[in-house]
């Protein structure tokens, strides 16, 4: 039997506000446990929550960016459940009237096609605290620094049909919230976490299968592995005559499998009701207009501009626009170096390889955009060849200065003197007289392969400094003259 996979995602993004959503406590990551928890965060009696307007503004930014409906009147509700790191015994969230309604996000698939993923809603809520199990023998510690941190929970439609589509969607959300500046996207620190709802159904069946939710997956690689593992588990279970039970599961990356955590709750299990301590939030058109006016260029807009303005392929444009920092770096290189396609190649290949090797992001690059742009200028004016440029790039990465100083100190300037190249070629051809005769006796097809040998010998003789274009032109004339 052929199976179809159905995936919907809930992405929890920690908003980059200076203070928490309902209190004045700081949201700095990594502080000593319980040093950023006020009486409001601790759930002490007699204290009242006060809504952080910046969190509302950020939620509206996201909603406008995905062309979503923004609720003119939205309500905060109490989501009731017990857990040790939830001090009030309820979480302040949104249910019936969320701040962001239906929207959509377009994702680029591996084959270059674009798929539209629906967004059901995005609502504001407070994060819970954190249970610490490792440092306490036979006990659990509670850190409430995270309690009350503003979250925007982004709920997708069940529109994804493979783990790769799901990862592409999460990457698109990740890029978008970073572009907007509303979340740092640091998955290792929990700034962006994903719950994956997975089900399978026979190909052609309209009704959805029974779904299972995989909680708190925090890397792109684990999202793909967790979903694929759960897909296979469900298919194996059904084909063996069993039934999928709706439940919440956890992904174990060491065993590459999901395991049952608890039965899946429905909304009525949480007994949602409007929070009496918080008034309904009314979002006026003037507020929305001010938010819209402050929106930056979005990833999809940047991709389109990179293609039209710089003549880049869709693939190159998508790669370069995958993060705001990389896009800005690329444009800075182009503004200095001039050649967009050359800049794109160096940023994606050579710089990308260097950053991967060092394990750093582009904003920590040892080679600045000014340095790389300056080096590309020297390629374009024939001061150095592309091959020599790699030596210059390595020296810049090692902190030896800019391109001009490195070219000067290492004597890397390209030989462009026609007379000098002509003399060098004569000496090289004389030393390879037998190969010259073979070349002249060969047919056109064989000559193409043999010509590369002479080019290689010429570059070797010049220690890579001869201008390759001049070498090719003069060499062809000598061999066929």
UniProtKB/Swiss-Prot annotation:
Q: Which InterPro entries match?
A: Asn/Gln-tRNA_amidoTrfase_suB/E (IPR017959), Asn/Gln-tRNA_Trfase_suB/E_cat (IPR006075), Asn/Gln_amidotransferase (IPR018027), Asn/Gln_tRNA_amidoTrase-B-like (IPR003789), GatB (IPR004413), GatB_C_1 (IPR042114), GatB_Yqey_C_2 (IPR023168), Gln-tRNA_amidoTrfase_suB_CS (IPR017958)
Q: EC number(s)?
A: 6.3.5.-
One GO molecular function term? Answer: glutaminyl-tRNA synthase (glutamine-hydrolyzing) activity
Keywords for the protein's UniProt record, in alphabetical order: ATP-binding, Ligase, Nucleotide-binding, Protein biosynthesis
Q: Does the keyword Disulfide bond apply?
A: no
Q: Which domain of life is it from?
A: Bacteria
Which reactions are catalysed by this chain? L-glutamyl-tRNA(Gln) + L-glutamine + ATP + H2O = L-glutaminyl-tRNA(Gln) + L-glutamate + ADP + phosphate + H(+); L-aspartyl-tRNA(Asn) + L-glutamine + ATP + H2O = L-asparaginyl-tRNA(Asn) + L-glutamate + ADP + phosphate + 2 H(+)
Instruction: Identify the SMART domains for this entry.
Output: GatB_Yqey (SM00845)
* UniProt cross-references to PANTHER family, sorted A to Z: GLUTAMYL-TRNA GLN AMIDOTRANSFERASE SUBUNIT B MITOCHONDRIAL AND PROKARYOTIC PET112-RELATED (PTHR11659), GLUTAMYL-TRNA(GLN) AMIDOTRANSFERASE SUBUNIT B, MITOCHONDRIAL (PTHR11659:SF0)
Q: Name the HAMAP family for this protein.
A: GatB (MF_00121)
Q: Subunit notes for this chain?
A: Heterotrimer of A, B and C subunits.
Can you tell me which family this protein belongs to? Belongs to the GatB/GatE family. GatB subfamily.
Specify the protein name: Aspartyl/glutamyl-tRNA(Asn/Gln) amidotransferase subunit B
Q: Which organism is it from?
A: Pseudomonas entomophila (strain L48)
Per UniProt, what is the name of the gene that codes for the protein in this document? gatB
